[in-house]
Amino acid sequence: MTDYRAFHLTVIGASHIKNGMVCQDFSLSCELPDRRISVVCDGHGGADYFRSDRGSRFAAEAFTECMKDPDLISVLSAAATQKQQSLRIEQLIKSIIARWNELVEQDIKEHSFGEDELSGVSEKARKRYETGQRMQSAYGTTLIGVILTENFWLGLQIGDGRCVAVSKDGEFTQPIPWDEQCFLNVTTSICDENAAKEFRFCFERTLPAAVFIGSDGIDDCFAGDERLYDFYRLTLRSFAQTNDQTAVSQLKDYLPTLSEKGSGDDMSVGIIVNTDFARQKPTVFEKSQQAFQNEVTP
């Protein structure tokens, strides 16, 4: 596993800075001897979701905790059929949701909703929260997470944002099925009552050269998938041409500019990349020569 590295980046959006809003995104990554983990979460924001910045952090923590389960790799590796894979992944999804709800419930217990938080919510949400119903909605967030091991990689998602996988032939794909319920500002959420059924996933035995996961603040900057792929292609070229720390630093330094010129939203990127492959086969990622600033929509 030493040839794969895991990274995560989150920056506050330009519009959030302008309007005095907190960052709603949260991301984590982890490198263990037998696995690499990365996750990005995007809290919904808005008056009814007044604790979604905490919700995104709890979602990232819940995902990471579940991915660290010592038995997880053997359980998923032993799944011989697609049906077995689906059943075990569905159980994993339920565990993530349950852990997120535990973290939310503990936070509510320690920090009850205040009048300053409830004053701006809709009448419908206020009635619900004041009667103790669906209080986790205040923490609503999306989630995209990836785990990569020696034998497989798994991607899980609820809500918007994009997971982009790059094969060792240089092909860019989005292996997690898209949810048509996610459109414009509407998205599914880990706080939904039927969240377990709304999760999508991909399970692959062939390891990629890299996997990128990005909150919708990233993909909303680009006019189509090919422009998004060019952005990640240039990121891979950075890994090929410099050391890991420099590549990540360059990306983090650029994201505020991307937000300002593009979506204005918070931005999170998770990366799991075979850095050895990127440096040994850099020409695989040289399809585009366009600069970042030419890739953002007006």
What is each of the regions a protein language model found here?
Residues 31-34, 148-152, 159, 166-170, ...:
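Short acidic-glycine loop/turn motifs at beta-strand connectors
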Residues 1-68, 161, 192-202, 263-270:
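N-terminal entry segment of metal-dependent catalytic domains or homologous docking segments
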Residues 38-41, 156-158, 212-214:
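Short hydrophobic beta-strand that contains or immediately precedes a catalytic carboxylate
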Residues 185-298:
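C-terminal catalytic subdomain
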